[in-house]
Amino acid sequence: MATFIDFHALQTLPPSNINRGEDGAPKTAAFGGTRRQRISSQALKAAQRRDFAHMLNRDELGVRTKQIVAETAARVCAADPEVSPTEAEKWSSAAFGKAGIKVAKPKAKKDEEPKPEQAGYLVFLGNHQLDRLAAAIVEKRDQAFTKKEVLEIIDTEHAVDVSLFGRMIADDAALNVDAAVQTAHAIGVSEAAPDFDFYTAVDDFTKAEEETGAGMMGTIEMMSSTFYRYATLNVDQLLENLGSEEALVRAIDAYARTFILSLPTGYQNSFAAHTLPDLINVAVRKRPVSYVNAFEKAVAPDERGTIAAASEAMADEASKVTELYGLAPERSWLIASDALEADVDSLGQKTGFAELVSQLEEHVRAQITEDER
């Protein structure tokens, strides 16, 4: 049976707009009959991918681009300066064609130099996969690849971010990578209450007697919410994608850190909503369980505030899951302030941030050792 690691967080943001829709307003969703502020899963994952650059080495990460031919060709030329850019592009294009990834020349504007062939969609490949492909092209030069040879390079030992968040190749489903992480849209635990920031700016070189109005004015919509965030990580799927137990441990360590610490950055120059979670619960289970239904009824703040009421509701939901379905976690850790501890101590073993990451890593290593017996 598969092993899952569930990540739960309650996090309060002051007035802000870190994830907006096409109308510029903070994203929202209906839940429990009320409108809630929302942070999309795509925005959360994008922030996490950016943070990985500070936690993992370049060769452990991937790039997502249509320009796979130009990117590979550049690495071919870097590996062997005697290869011309034209040759490198031709050989790179042929290699991707063998793999079943279609590339074509993009339409050039008038008087614009022709560009290298591109994929018709974003392709997510590991840096080390592109480096290995470039090295193989340098070795084979104009000798044709077989499909098996190319797939052995670009469809094995995937990068950490590719392994976590998955990959879809429109031309060939066999090249898809099943995501090891499922990420929920973060939602506010209480009803959304939009507000507006009307701002003006004055032209520094306009004299007061010449103009009394503003040089520019506008409005930014903002909201403040306590969010419930949830994601689940399939340990077995991640191991299959990475192909290495050591890479698995490093990936889980990095993901735990980035889930806790990262957020989208929309309008942060205007709002500086750089908060950290008020509560973190990480649980190891045999099947994923979200506690979002704790907030199906919008939380009303009491004299202790919204976060205390939301924490109590989440702990009650976790207890209900255990009582009704017998789905108690194998291990569970909790990060919470002393003020919340009495309400949430049933969620797991209280610990600190560094200790949680370390103990989670130890648990995964022990689980691997046990599975190998």
Predicted regions and their residues:
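Basic polyanion-binding and macromolecular-assembly surfaces
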Residues: 1-38, 42-373
